Amino acid sequence: GVACLCDADGPSVSGNTLSGILWLAGCPSGWHNCKAHGPTIGWCCKK
């Protein structure tokens, strides 16, 4: 997957660690959708 910004990482993509992974077919086991707003499918962060 491609790294993505989790809500817990900070407000912007630049200067923050991207701890999420963008999955096209939902989140793998042990992960959850990390975006509390907007489209959440595929934006996965570790629980």
Curated annotation (Swiss-Prot):
Signal peptide residue numbers: none
Name of the molecule in the record: Delta-actitoxin-Axm1e
Pfam families in the cross-refs: Toxin_4
Species per Swiss-Prot/TrEMBL record: Anthopleura xanthogrammica (Giant green sea anemone)
Primary localization class, coarse: secreted
Subcellular location(s) per record: Secreted; Nematocyst
Disulfide bridges in this chain: 4-44, 6-34, 27-45
Gene Ontology biological process terms in this record: regulation of signal transduction
Keywords: Cardiotoxin, Disulfide bond, Ion channel impairing toxin, Nematocyst, Neurotoxin, Secreted, Toxin, Voltage-gated sodium channel impairing toxin
One Gene Ontology cellular component: nematocyst
Job description of the protein: Binds specifically to voltage-gated sodium channels (Nav), thereby delaying their inactivation. This toxin is active on a variety of voltage-gated sodium channels (Nav1.1/SCN1A, Nav1.2/SCN2A, Nav1.3/SCN3A, Nav1.4/SCN4A, Nav1.5/SCN5A and Nav1.6/SCN8A).
Family: Belongs to the sea anemone sodium channel inhibitory toxin family. Type I subfamily.
A single MF term (Gene Ontology): toxin activity
